[in-house]
Amino acid sequence: MPIIRKILARQILDSRGNPTVEVDVYTENSFGRAAVPSGASTGVHEAVELRDGDSAVYLGKGVLKAVDHVNTVINDRLKGMFVTDQEEIDMAMLALDGTPNKSRLGANALLGVSMACAKAGAEYSGLPLYRYIGGTMANTLPVPMMNVLNGGAHADNTVDFQEFMIMPVGFSSYSDALRSGAEIFHALKSLLKSKGLSTAVGDEGGFAPNLKSNEEAIELVIEAVGKAGYKIGSSTANGGLGDAQVMIALDPASSEFYDAAKQKYVFKKSSKQELSSLEMAEYWEKWASDYPIISIEDGMAEDDWDGWKILTDKIGSRVQLVGDDLFVTNTSRLALGIERGVGNSILVKVNQIGTLTETLQAIDLARRNGYTAVISHRSGETEDSTIAQIAVATNAGQIKTGSLSRSDRMAKYNELLRIEEELGLQAKYPALSAFRV
């Protein structure tokens, strides 16, 4: 019987050496384990990640309170339930927490249990997790957003924007796309060395050199694509997709350099330039005209709705505009964005909302309204590869899970290789069809 017998949580360490929650779920004849990720640049509207706050232990970042909630109240409530009743399990935990932002039990407690239950349910059913969640039509491998150059909150350097990414859009298989990313990563490393620049990496495995400007960062990435022997696209303003093998994606994480008091975007790490919302939107419009950019995530701050609308009206027909801090994987925030006509894509981070059911609901709402969904990691990760399974389960078509270094990032890429191998001829790589621009 798939009845939950025991739920056991523990405190482990993530890729930044900070505590996080790991959960084991036991039934009579199945088992599931999940570890919870954590972000560095977090949106103010995210569900609450419960930390202990004791500065003498792990600098206040311990998660023993969340662990205790799993081992006591959540365990007591879910014991005896069928592990295969995912929605009922998640709804029971939401009722138990009773707050709109999971602040009582902690989203990190709820998510660990939710994902571990799904894994135990999949094992009981004799199915891989992607098939258990997504059914027989789950067969689309995602186009990766590979974060090869870091700045912003993810690196101690002079670059304001958080992530400069490559997207292999001109390939017929995931494995070939991944190979191109790895080769471009190594070409970029060689290029940086030749210029006397640092090849130290940031939280997500991308390089984090000190550069003269934000423009130099994107130009280095473009140069590395060519150095690796791949064809970079041109600006989408000039119909630049064509036979492109690689396009550029950005995550400036604009909330991180938005000064709410001044209502200005301040380039604190580089030029000290201050831009209004209109000027920031015009900045991205120029970049989208000058460079082969196919996607911009969080191009405006999380509560700058007017700025988001300006940006969407300017370039939303030709560039994927992804809401991360804007939508925080929350159906209410996403519904508001749809109503206001801002963005055209949602970044999906399971720990922003706290349960698998709510995550799937957000993806469904996006899809029904013509928005794409990008399944995403966090900067603080573990060896857990659940998001790779979710990407295939939902046929999302895109995944964002870091650079081509650090085993916490490679765990997801390698899991997708295994899934592609398992699917065989059924496996689909969407390439440019993953985008709706």
Curated annotation (Swiss-Prot):
The active site is at 204 (proton donor), 349 (proton acceptor). InterPro entries: Enolase, Enolase-like_C_sf, Enolase-like_N, Enolase_C, Enolase_CS, Enolase_N. The keyword Metal-binding applies. Coiled coil: none annotated. Mg(2+) binds at residues 251, 297, 324. Binds a second Mg(2+) ion via substrate during catalysis. Its EC number is 4.2.1.11. Keywords: Cytoplasm, Glycolysis, Lyase, Magnesium, Metal-binding, Secreted. Its main location: cytoplasm. Gene3D superfamilies: Enolase-like C-terminal domain, Enolase-like, N-terminal domain. This is Enolase. It is found in: Cytoplasm; Secreted; Cell surface. The lineage of its organism: Bacteria, Pseudomonadati, Chlorobiota, Chlorobiia, Chlorobiales. NCBIfam families: eno. One of its GO terms (cellular component) is extracellular region. SMART domains: Enolase_C, Enolase_N. Pathway: Carbohydrate degradation; glycolysis; pyruvate from D-glyceraldehyde 3-phosphate: step 4/5. It comes from Chlorobium phaeobacteroides (strain DSM 266 / SMG 266 / 2430). CDD domains: enolase. Catalyzes the reversible conversion of 2-phosphoglycerate (2-PG) into phosphoenolpyruvate (PEP). It is essential for the degradation of carbohydrates via glycolysis. Belongs to the enolase family. The gene is eno. Its cofactor is Mg(2+). (2R)-2-phosphoglycerate binds at residues 162, 349, 378-379, 400. GO terms for molecular function: magnesium ion binding; phosphopyruvate hydratase activity.
